[in-house]
Amino acid sequence: MERIKELRDLMSQSRTREILTKTTVDHMAIIKKYTSGRQEKNPALRMKWMMAMKYPITADKRIMEMIPERNEQGQTLWSKTNDAGSDRVMVSPLAVTWWNRNGPTTSTVHYPKVYKTYFEKVERLKHGTFGPVHFRNQVKIRRRVDMNPGHADLSAKEAQDVIMEVVFPNEVGARILTSESQLTITKEKREELKNCNIAPLMVAYMLERELVRKTRFLPVAGGTSSVYIEVLHLTQGTCWEQMYTPGGEVRNDDVDQSLIIAARNIVRRATVSADPLASLLEMCHSTQIGGVRMVDILKQNPTEEQAVDICKAAMGLKISSSFSFGGFTFKRTKGFSVKREEEVLTGNLQTLKIKVHEGYEEFTMVGRRATAILRKATRRMIQLIVSGRDEQSIAEAIIVAMVFSQEDCMIKAVRGDLNFVNRANQRLNPMHQLLRHFQKDAKVLFQNWGIEPIDNVMGMIGILPDMTPSTEMSLRGVRVSKMGVDEYSSTERVVVSIDRFLRVRDQRGNVLLSPEEVSETQGMEKLTITYSSSMMWEINGPESVLVNTYQWIIRNWETVKIQWSQEPTMLYNKMEFEPFQSLVPKAARSQYSGFVRTLFQQMRDVLGTFDTVQIIKLLPFAAAPPEQSRMQFSSLTVNVRGSGMRILVRGNSPAFNYNKTTKRLTILGKDA
């Protein structure tokens, strides 16, 4: 009260009122604010009052020789007065116009090369097709996506070294270009940018766009490859989407897609071999994708997919700490658990040994078509909030979560025996047994789960055992949400270990990945995948196995010949003959092998009966474990082209034909 009274007294004096209302603002603090530091405090205002002046621009004195004092309209382009405080000339904005129209021109040949990513983007947009706009609720989830199409996959450090080498080759500083891609790019770019007049800094900035993958964590509904992300602002809003087909593909998307296909094929093939881990490594090291070694791509490419991550783990690379189950990526966001083995009885009274997770935990589950939040305690699902594209996708997520929860009612819902096996004919572990069982048919699981009345919560509805939505009732603990669950945003990578059966574990021993998690989806790779390993010959069917086996023998004939005479057993055990065995009828394998080995022994014993063509022809049959019998064969059967084809022991056949005069060998009509 005292203060107010004091202020009133002050205001009653006319002088005070005048000072407070009429005087100019020349307060020291304000002057300081607008004059200290180099940072412009009010850029918009500064721009306005600068442009209101006649000569807002300053330029080097040389400009007076390069630009006339007046333009064609007689307007002054620069003033003879010096800029205060510097020896520069005051210039009118009209001078810029004059320069743009009449100034010297420079070669534009380097522009498309330097601004390559922009030129290519324009082409993609020109040839892209935009479809109709649909208004509907968009379920977007944040995913880590690739922002700039058309990039290589160098690390920031590698790119920095390449840029310094290309743009500032004479700059001092230790730079070691190690990877093959670094050397190739450096050579290419040096050639391209010879005599380039564009500012080096700009060139460096544009090179960075081309060399490094830029990822952002963005809300997306729909395509996640970089050619879709570059038009994200045009294709999806909060309540609308516009159909779009890109007008071109870019190599980085193709590499990602082809890498996933190659990794899946390799993991599937490795699973059925005698030593899966060794086979996987052998295949990764001998495979090329679009002409680049797969191991180099794995080291640089951040794609997270189950098969790709198994290959990375095998190579000793770090991978994401989230784990995979039922095709969903699980990330624990709260709580912890300890594992304990427990024996449980299924509805069919079959005993299963499962590793029970004891403790309260919360997870996010992210799949291709559905996402969820799961809260669980020991063998109990507390809550599952799920969102997905359609009924089917939501059902998939619910099944995975129910199995993962390890609830008793789920185990009791099993009807019939669980005997699922993997590609190598080994029984799956109990959790995957349960998963496969309910993925085939979840009717009993949903019926036995139980339902509960639900409260009306904004954005959430219930779902009934037959997967229809409801506002009154829902499966116990399960709700369907309009909002998606964001993918785990962290790019943190952890050290993992892998066993010989390709199970990947973190340092605490939790299984993050196993071959059971690798998708069976087949796709056509965008880039050529060259598998040099004999284990992958069968990927293109029986014919390819037949041709490749004989080609291998011919390519390595010099060493094969010596081994054939000196250490045949070692030769017979070569892994290159393994795929061929699948072509020989099971019942005949060991008989053929015994017969051919005996024949070869006779050739070795009787000098001068060495018959190159016959050895090449029969050698693959000798690889199976032999059966000692006196059986003789005039022809051997191989299963190609959907039926048995004969290879004649003495003589030619369509499957194996050698022309003595032209010295041409054809396998199934193809040159070997």
Swiss-Prot record:
<dbReference type="GO" id="GO:0039545">
    <property type="term" value="P:symbiont-mediated suppression of host cytoplasmic pattern recognition receptor signaling pathway via inhibition of MAVS activity"/>
</dbReference>
<dbReference type="Pfam" id="PF20949">
    <property type="entry name" value="Flu_PB2_3rd"/>
</dbReference>
<dbReference type="GO" id="GO:0075526">
    <property type="term" value="P:cap snatching"/>
</dbReference>
<dbReference type="InterPro" id="IPR049111">
    <property type="entry name" value="Flu_PB2_middle"/>
</dbReference>
<keyword id="KW-1191">Eukaryotic host transcription shutoff by virus</keyword>
<dbReference type="Pfam" id="PF20947">
    <property type="entry name" value="Flu_PB2_1st"/>
</dbReference>
<dbReference type="GO" id="GO:0044423">
    <property type="term" value="C:virion component"/>
</dbReference>
<keyword id="KW-1157">Cap snatching</keyword>
<keyword id="KW-0507">mRNA processing</keyword>
<keyword id="KW-1090">Inhibition of host innate immune response by virus</keyword>
<keyword id="KW-1195">Viral transcription</keyword>
<keyword id="KW-0899">Viral immunoevasion</keyword>
<dbReference type="GO" id="GO:0006370">
    <property type="term" value="P:7-methylguanosine mRNA capping"/>
</dbReference>
<dbReference type="Pfam" id="PF20948">
    <property type="entry name" value="Flu_PB2_2nd"/>
</dbReference>
<dbReference type="GO" id="GO:0033650">
    <property type="term" value="C:host cell mitochondrion"/>
</dbReference>
<dbReference type="InterPro" id="IPR049113">
    <property type="entry name" value="PB2_helical"/>
</dbReference>
<comment type="similarity">
    <text>Belongs to the influenza viruses PB2 family.</text>
</comment>
<dbReference type="Pfam" id="PF20951">
    <property type="entry name" value="Flu_PB2_6th"/>
</dbReference>
<dbReference type="GO" id="GO:0039657">
    <property type="term" value="P:symbiont-mediated suppression of host gene expression"/>
</dbReference>
<dbReference type="InterPro" id="IPR048298">
    <property type="entry name" value="Flu_PB2_CAP-bd"/>
</dbReference>
<keyword id="KW-1097">Inhibition of host MAVS by virus</keyword>
<dbReference type="Pfam" id="PF20950">
    <property type="entry name" value="Flu_PB2_4th"/>
</dbReference>
<keyword id="KW-1104">Inhibition of host RNA polymerase II by virus</keyword>
<dbReference type="GO" id="GO:0042025">
    <property type="term" value="C:host cell nucleus"/>
</dbReference>
<keyword id="KW-1113">Inhibition of host RLR pathway by virus</keyword>
<keyword id="KW-1262">Eukaryotic host gene expression shutoff by virus</keyword>
<keyword id="KW-0506">mRNA capping</keyword>
<keyword id="KW-1045">Host mitochondrion</keyword>
<keyword id="KW-0946">Virion</keyword>
<dbReference type="InterPro" id="IPR049106">
    <property type="entry name" value="Flu_PB2_N"/>
</dbReference>
<comment type="subunit">
    <text>Influenza RNA polymerase is composed of three subunits: PB1, PB2 and PA. Interacts (via N-terminus) with PB1 (via C-terminus). Interacts with nucleoprotein NP (via N-terminus). Interacts (via N-terminus) with host MAVS (via N-terminus); this interaction inhibits host innate immune response.</text>
</comment>
<dbReference type="Pfam" id="PF00604">
    <property type="entry name" value="Flu_PB2_5th"/>
</dbReference>
<dbReference type="InterPro" id="IPR049110">
    <property type="entry name" value="Flu_PB2_2nd"/>
</dbReference>
<keyword id="KW-1190">Host gene expression shutoff by virus</keyword>
<keyword id="KW-1048">Host nucleus</keyword>
<dbReference type="GO" id="GO:0039523">
    <property type="term" value="P:symbiont-mediated suppression of host mRNA transcription via inhibition of RNA polymerase II activity"/>
</dbReference>
<keyword id="KW-0945">Host-virus interaction</keyword>
<dbReference type="InterPro" id="IPR049114">
    <property type="entry name" value="Flu_PB2_6th"/>
</dbReference>
<comment type="function">
    <text>Plays an essential role in transcription initiation and cap-stealing mechanism, in which cellular capped pre-mRNAs are used to generate primers for viral transcription. Binds the cap of the target pre-RNA which is subsequently cleaved after 10-13 nucleotides by PA. Plays a role in the initiation of the viral genome replication and modulates the activity of the ribonucleoprotein (RNP) complex. In addition, participates in the inhibition of type I interferon induction through interaction with the host mitochondrial antiviral signaling protein MAVS.</text>
</comment>
<protein>
    <recommendedName>
        <fullName>Polymerase basic protein 2</fullName>
    </recommendedName>
</protein>
